[in-house]
Amino acid sequence: MEVYIPSFRYEESDLERGYTVFKIEVLMNGRKHFVEKRYSEFHALHKKLKKCIKTPEIPSKHVRNWVPKVLEQRRQGLETYLQAVILENEELPKLFLDFLNVRHLPSLPKTESYGSFDETESEESSKLSHQPVLLFLRDPYVLPAASDFPNVVIEGVLHGIFYPHLQPR
């Protein structure tokens, strides 16, 4: 699992004074989703985590300080905090995974399974993000080979698949 906090924004509210929202990017098993959290939510998580695992220090909250430089330092500190929790703990607590909106799948014995893969899918937030492993610049079956030399292996395989009743030349 990889966690980053690429940005933050100031949110104004009619009911209370404004606050800062941190955008958390979570990458897990080739999937990426975003979660937005306030500093108070990070602080509440930290208090709960301290009871069950060893936690790094959380950046301090400067009371009502919306100076961009201070907020950027806090963003970096919170990102480092999340990454340190992941690095220092082999098994992450459920409340940490819930904070990041990650579905917790307990490890099962090899004889058990979850049924269909679709049941373990999370909703919209888990879109695949991957890169192609193999890329053809031209269709190898439609366009002829650029070289004049015949590809004996491919011809043999195609001959064996499509014309098994004929003897090779």
Swiss-Prot record:
Keywords: Acetylation, Cytoplasmic vesicle, Lipid-binding, Membrane, Phosphoprotein, Protein transport, Transport. The modification N-acetylmethionine is found at residue 1. Its main location: membrane. It is a peripheral membrane protein. GO terms for cellular component: cytoplasmic vesicle membrane. Residues 1-125 form the PX domain. It is found in: Cytoplasmic vesicle membrane. Pfam families: PX (PF00787). InterPro entries: PX_dom, PX_dom_sf, Sorting_nexin_PX-domain. The modification Phosphoserine is found at residues 113, 116. GO terms for molecular function: phosphatidylinositol phosphate binding. A 1,2-diacyl-sn-glycero-3-phospho-(1D-myo-inositol-3-phosphate) binds at residues 38, 40, 61, 74. One of its GO terms (biological process) is protein transport. May be involved in several stages of intracellular trafficking. PANTHER family: SORTING NEXIN-22 AND 24, SORTING NEXIN-24. The PX domain mediates specific binding to membranes enriched in phosphatidylinositol 3-phosphate (PtdIns(P3)). Belongs to the sorting nexin family. This is Sorting nexin-24. It comes from Bos taurus (Bovine). The lineage of its organism: Eukaryota, Metazoa, Chordata, Craniata, Vertebrata.
